[in-house]
């Protein structure tokens, strides 16, 4: 019997497995844009646990399940006994008998880890205080769609501007997994921690990528292909007032036209959204032709479809790359013939 796998952290997957997920997502995106909805998840049910509110995560997962023939069950805060009257472990065991896969967006990373360790079904991390792996996958798809002409992903540099949020950490995890050069341009005290850098170092040893943490804007932005930012209050929301946040990050770490001009001419701007206009990014940048933030939001759906198929379709129950290649051929044929409509 094959060991159950979960999507808690991309460090648990090889570069080849991540690239395969990306390819599944891109092929299904193309198929659906052409009006073909492969029913790969027919009769499957996703249970969605939310300790935090969400727009993109909830809508993306629900839409993905519907498009592929399945059903999503929303479990809102206060509607289930997660960690309250009922333990996290007991909740996981019960839901394992009722649904086929779980997604959890939680306040503490340990909660989703405990769900995964106890559940008999796959568990997907929809975001925790440590990382945001589904965002990682959607962002990777977006970068592949917007690669500079003549460049491979391994040739690209991505710069994260600002606070060391879980999205910043996840951006580094994915970039170094893919062999990219990653830079965090942020102030001391708000830079990625040693536990994050250890993962990046391990990734780079395998992929040939690199990482750098700096307060020097010119070093950070030189030849950047992608610039990414997030809100300024991620992990430190309870520690800093709005006035203190602005004093720490503004204006040096605001993504504006001047900062963009220091990057490569073909640079693309990324943001996980929602954005606080006028703080971490100006309207001029967020709405610019080089901004790909709406593509990113759409590719959350692309990523969710890929993950759900990867973990629930029988061809990829075992995630070895040989199986991935076999399923790749099956999916190619299915999409070409428009089967399952």
Curated annotation (Swiss-Prot):
Catalytic activity: carbamoyl phosphate + putrescine = N-carbamoylputrescine + phosphate + H(+)
UniProt KW Transferase keyword: yes
One Gene Ontology term from the biological process aspect of the record: arginine biosynthetic process via ornithine
Gene Ontology CC terms, in alphabetical order: cytoplasm
Keyword ATP-binding: no
SUPFAM superfamilies, alphabetized: Aspartate/ornithine carbamoyltransferase
Any single Pfam family the record assigns to this protein: OTCace_N
Main location: cytoplasm
A GO term for molecular function: amino acid binding
Binding residues annotated for carbamoyl phosphate, in chain numbering: 54-58, 105, 132
Binding site for putrescine: 271-274
Localization of this protein: Cytoplasm
EC number(s) stated in the UniProt entry for this protein: 2.1.3.6
Enzyme class: transferase
Keyword line: Cytoplasm, Polyamine biosynthesis, Transferase
UniProt pathway: Amine and polyamine biosynthesis; putrescine biosynthesis via agmatine pathway; putrescine from N-carbamoylputrescine (transferase route): step 1/1
Top-level taxonomic group: Bacteria
Site (Important for structural integrity): 29, 145
Quaternary data: Homotrimer.
Role description: Catalyzes the phosphorolysis of N-carbamoylputrescine to form carbamoyl phosphate and putrescine. Is involved in the degradation pathway of the polyamine agmatine.
PANTHER family for this protein: ORNITHINE CARBAMOYLTRANSFERASE, MITOCHONDRIAL (PTHR45753), ORNITHINE TRANSCARBAMYLASE, MITOCHONDRIAL (PTHR45753:SF3)
Family: Belongs to the aspartate/ornithine carbamoyltransferase superfamily. PTCase family.
Name this polypeptide is given: Putrescine carbamoyltransferase
């Amino acid at each position: 019997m094959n060991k159950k796998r979960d999507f808690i952290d991309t460090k648990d997957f090889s570069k080849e497995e991540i690239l395969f997920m990306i390819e599944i997502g891109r092929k299904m995106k193309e198929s659906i844009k052409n009006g073909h909805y492969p029913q790969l998840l027919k009769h499957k049910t996703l249970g969605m646990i939310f300790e935090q509110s969400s727009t993109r995560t909830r809508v993306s997962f629900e839409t993905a399940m519907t498009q592929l023939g399945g059903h999503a069950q929303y479990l809102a805060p206060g509607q289930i006994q997660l960690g309250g009257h009922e333990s996290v472990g007991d909740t996981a065991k019960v839901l394992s008998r009722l649904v086929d896969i779980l997604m959890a967006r939680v306040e503490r990373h340990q909660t989703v880890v405990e769900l995964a360790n106890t559940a008999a079904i796959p568990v997907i991390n929809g975001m925790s205080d440590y990382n945001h792996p589904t965002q990682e996958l959607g962002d990777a798809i977006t970068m592949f769609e917007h690669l500079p002409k003549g460049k491979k992903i391994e040739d690209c540099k991505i710069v994260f501007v600002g606070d060391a949020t879980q999205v910043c950490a996840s951006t580094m995890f994915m970039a170094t997994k893919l062999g990219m050069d990653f830079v965090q341009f942020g102030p001391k005290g708000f830079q990625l921690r040693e536990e994050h850098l250890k993962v990046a170092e391990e990734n780079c040893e395998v992929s040939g990528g690199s990482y750098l943490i700096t307060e020097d804007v010119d070093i950070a932005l030189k030849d950047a292909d992608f610039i990414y930012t997030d809100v300024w209050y991620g992990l430190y929301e309870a520690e800093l007032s709005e006035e203190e946040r602005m004093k720490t990050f503004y204006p040096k770490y605001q993504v504006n036209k001047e900062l963009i001009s220091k990057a490569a001419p073909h640079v693309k701007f990324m943001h996980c959204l929602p954005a606080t206009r006028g703080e971490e990014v100006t309207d001029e940048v967020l709405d610019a032709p080089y901004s790909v933030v709406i593509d990113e939001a759409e590719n959350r759906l692309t990523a969710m479809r890929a993950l759900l198929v990867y973990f629930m379709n029988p061809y990829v129950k075992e995630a070895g790359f040989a199986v991935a290649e076999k399923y790749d051929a099956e999916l190619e044929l299915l999409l070409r013939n428009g089967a399952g409509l």
